[in-house]
């Protein structure tokens, strides 16, 4: 690998070329200033980063020793006292409110869906950024949200019976979201704008209007016969598209051809758990796509239905407001970027001792440099109109690590000439030590915090690893009913509201992991806004459009106001360990648990290691497609490792299960021409060996993280391919 030496850093030549020739021009930052500051950052803060990781291991060792002696805690007071004594559970300081300033309304005040997308994939990134607006008709027609009964099958061509059900659903949605003073939306015949009023002429000739006139936000086209009508509810917009020249509009009594919803209000462009970036070549791909998003020139050639076209970022949408002024609505989702956490290093840059630099330091420096194209002195202000950069920081353990991330951000701001606190922070509440010290974590970032989010997947992985020695864990499917998890979800909202996050920041909930099950999502995911979360994660633009309907039905600001008076969730519940009281499962139950875990692990790992795909839809044992990323992998691997450690299963049983399930995963991937089968070549399949490592060596992985094994095995495969 060719390297360029700068201020004691050995930088991969390809990364150096990208930074100097592509990322820096237009930012006002010159190469010497950048690399000098980057070197200072690495050499000043690298040792502190490593010390924090040592502290994680020391605390884990103390916990392991306690559990080996006591088992799962019964006397919670004694357990709590031990956690305080070792510095795991910290004293809580006085009440305070966060003071984060210059936050865009998409984060501060608008409640709505949030996408998380692998930024390494330009097509996915563009689709997500453009998912600010989505067709409700398409989302309903193309998913199981509308049942395929009574002749309403999806089929190949357009099915008018299905279309009629879609239209009826959308009209009922309009009745609930923007009711008319008289009549229903299904009675509408035509529309006009008279003065500042939307007039809806009904089939019987009577005139109606929205019951609440403030809900009419604007229109496009001729006021006597508008082409689009904009309505607003709970800060979210609905666009009714009127076009009688289209097949749908022609068949519609009112000429409505579509109902478009403001959908993914925010999107996390992910450099972490949903991607596989193990070296400089990969990191340049990640950073180049982020650069295209910040400069607004990211493009991707797409072929759909035999037609080729170029996908670009959508422009803003212009309408006429009721008072005649121009109403401009953002065309794109507000983008956040998720950097990696404090754990991993990357060979893209070496320090003066020849050691790999902490990847989190590199991500902070490079993603912020690139964000100058949006928020710098000459920035476009096309993403953040408030001049902020939004960085999601994952996998932090406790307030000291949050404070360290703030220190990194402050150093980067100073290096790049950004105002203090321009780099905002999203805190993933996905590690147990962060959960139990959440108030102090928020305090450490009180001038930067723009979201706290419960990542229940990683959080479950950490729960298992933290208490690995306490005993065999309950089955994975039973985790969601365990006392700690509901307490954790409520505690996050309670503490966030106590710290004054309303109006400043998002309180977020986790991912709906079944992208094909949209009817179930429509039924169930409304619990997130009802729980006081003003955002929640969805797996696709379509899911964002459907989940957006929940924020029309639930006014999250009102929910949050009502929750402020409730008693905070109990710490003792959060600290309860999900160990099986009587692990008396049948052999069949144990084997089914192993099969399901093994299938998820193999289905994900084989694509990660062999093809560098960091986010996959993997069929589970019941053939339901589940979105798998490193967080779901962490749970499955740690769960199997726990049962192995406590003798519920044997190593031979795990190997047999993995080999048997590998053949099933091979079959599920039979249609992929790039796929390398695992069955029959278990010793030589690097992916299969990686999957085994994750389980058989699961106890020794730092905090149960999967990155060290995945990175090592992917690099091994790339070296083999390059040889």
Curated annotation (Swiss-Prot):
The modification Cysteine sulfenic acid (-SOH) is found at residue 615. Pfam families: MS_C, MS_N, MS_TIM-barrel, MSG_insertion. Its EC number is 2.3.3.9. Pathway: Carbohydrate metabolism; glyoxylate cycle; (S)-malate from isocitrate: step 2/2. It comes from the Bacteria. It catalyses: glyoxylate + acetyl-CoA + H2O = (S)-malate + CoA + H(+). It is an enzyme of class 2 (transferase). Keywords: Cytoplasm, Glyoxylate bypass, Magnesium, Metal-binding, Oxidation, Transferase, Tricarboxylic acid cycle. CDD domains: malate_synt_G (cd00728). Its cofactor is Mg(2+). The keyword Acetylation does not apply. The keyword Acyltransferase does not apply. Mg(2+) binds at residues 430, 458. InterPro entries: Malate_synth_C_sf, Malate_synth_sf, Malate_synthase_TIM, Malate_synthG, MS_C, MS_N, MS_N_TIM-barrel_dom, MSG_insertion. GO terms for biological process: glyoxylate catabolic process; glyoxylate cycle; tricarboxylic acid cycle. GO terms for cellular component: cytosol. GO terms for molecular function: magnesium ion binding; malate synthase activity. The active site is at 338 (proton acceptor), 629 (proton donor). It is found in: Cytoplasm. Glyoxylate binds at residues 338, 430, 455-458. SUPFAM superfamilies: Malate synthase G (SSF51645). Acetyl-CoA binds at residues 116, 123-124, 274, 311, 539. Belongs to the malate synthase family. GlcB subfamily. Monomer. Involved in the glycolate utilization. Catalyzes the condensation and subsequent hydrolysis of acetyl-coenzyme A (acetyl-CoA) and glyoxylate to form malate and CoA. This is Malate synthase G. It comes from Rhizobium meliloti (strain 1021) (Ensifer meliloti). The lineage of its organism: Bacteria, Pseudomonadati, Pseudomonadota, Alphaproteobacteria, Hyphomicrobiales.
């Amino acid at each position: 690998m060719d390297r360029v030496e700068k201020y004691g850093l050995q930088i991969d030549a390809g990364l150096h070329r990208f930074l100097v020739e592509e990322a820096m021009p237009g930012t006002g930052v010159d190469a010497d200033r950048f690399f000098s500051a980057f070197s200072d950052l690495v050499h000043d803060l690298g040792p502190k980063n490593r010390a924090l990781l040592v502290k994680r291991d020391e605390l884990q060792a103390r916990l392991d020793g306690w559990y080996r002696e006591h088992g799962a805690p019964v006397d919670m007071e004694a357990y709590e006292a031990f956690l305080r004594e070792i510095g795991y559970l910290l004293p809580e300081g006085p009440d305070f409110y966060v003071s984060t300033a210059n936050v865009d309304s998409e984060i501060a005040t608008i409640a709505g869906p949030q996408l998380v997308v692998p930024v390494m994939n330009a097509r996915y990134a563009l689709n997500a950024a453009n998912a600010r607006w989505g067709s409700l008709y398409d989302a309903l027609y193309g998913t199981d949200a509308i049942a395929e009964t009574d002749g309403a099958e999806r089929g190949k061509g357009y099915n008018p019976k299905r279309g009629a059900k879609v239209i009826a659903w959308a009209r009922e949605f309009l009745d609930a979201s923007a009711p008319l003073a008289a009549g229903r939306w299904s009675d509408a015949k035509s529309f006009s704008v008279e003065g500042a009023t939307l007039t809806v002429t009904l089939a019987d000739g009577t005139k109606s209007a929205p019951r609440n006139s403030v809900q009419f936000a604007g229109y496009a086209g001729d006021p006597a016969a508008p082409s689009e009508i904009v309505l607003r509810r709970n800060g979210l917009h609905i666009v009714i598209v009127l076009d009688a020249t289209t097949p749908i509009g022609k068949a519609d009594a009112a000429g409505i051809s579509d109902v478009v919803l403001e959908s993914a209000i925010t999107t996390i462009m992910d450099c972490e758990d949903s991607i596989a970036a193990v070296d400089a070549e990969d990191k340049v791909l990640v950073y180049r796509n982020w650069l295209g998003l910040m400069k607004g020139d990211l493009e991707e050639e797409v072929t759909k239905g035999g037609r080729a076209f170029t996908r670009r970022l959508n422009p803003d949408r212009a309408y006429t407001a009721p008072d005649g002024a121009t109403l401009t609505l953002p065309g794109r989702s507000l983008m956040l970027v998720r950097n990696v956490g404090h754990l991993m290093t990357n060979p893209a840059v070496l320090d003066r001792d020849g050691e790999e630099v902490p990847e989190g330091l590199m991500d902070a420096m490079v993603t912020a440099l690139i964000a100058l194209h949006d928020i710098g002195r000459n920035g476009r202000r096309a993403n953040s109109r408030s001049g902020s950069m939004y960085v999601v920081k994952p996998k932090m353990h406790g307030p000291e690590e949050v404070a360290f991330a703030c220190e990194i951000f402050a150093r980067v701001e100073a290096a790049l000439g950004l105002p203090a606190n321009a780099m905002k922070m999203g805190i993933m509440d996905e590690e147990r030590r962060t959960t139990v010290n959440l108030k102090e974590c928020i305090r450490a970032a009180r001038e930067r915090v723009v979201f706290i989010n419960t990542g229940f997947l990683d959080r479950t992985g950490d729960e298992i690893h933290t208490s690995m020695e306490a005993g065999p864990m309950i089955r994975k499917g039973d985790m969601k009913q365990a006392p700690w998890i509901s307490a954790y979800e409520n505690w996050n909202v309670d503490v966030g509201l106590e710290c004054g996050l309303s109006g400043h920041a998002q309180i977020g909930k986790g991912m709906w992991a079944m992208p094909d099950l949209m009817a179930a999502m429509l039924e169930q995911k409304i619990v997130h806004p009802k729980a006081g979360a003003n955002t929640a994660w969805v797996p696709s633009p379509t899911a964002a459009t459907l989940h957006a309907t929940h924020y029309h039905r639930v006014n999250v600001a009102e929910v949050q106001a009502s929750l402020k008076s409730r008693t905070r969730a109990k710490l003792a519940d959060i600290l309860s360990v999900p160990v099986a009281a009587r692990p008396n499962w049948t052999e069949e139950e144990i084997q089914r648990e192993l099969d399901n875990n093994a299938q998820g692990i193999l289905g994900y790992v084989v694509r990660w290691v062999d093809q560098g795909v960091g986010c996959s839809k993997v069929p589970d044992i019941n053939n339901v497609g589940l979105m798998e990323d490193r967080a779901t992998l962490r749970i499955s691997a740690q769960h199997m490792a726990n049962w192995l450690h406590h003798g519920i299963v044997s190593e031979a049983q795990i190997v047999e299960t993995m080999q048997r399930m590998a053949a099933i995963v091979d079959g599920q991937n039979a249609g992929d021409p790039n796929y390398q089968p695992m069955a029959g070549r278990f010793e030589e399949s690097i992916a299969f060996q990686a999957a085994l490592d994750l389980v058989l060596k699961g106890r020794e992985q730092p905090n149960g993280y999967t990155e060290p094994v995945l990175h090592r095995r992917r690099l091994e495969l790339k070296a083999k391919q390059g040889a």
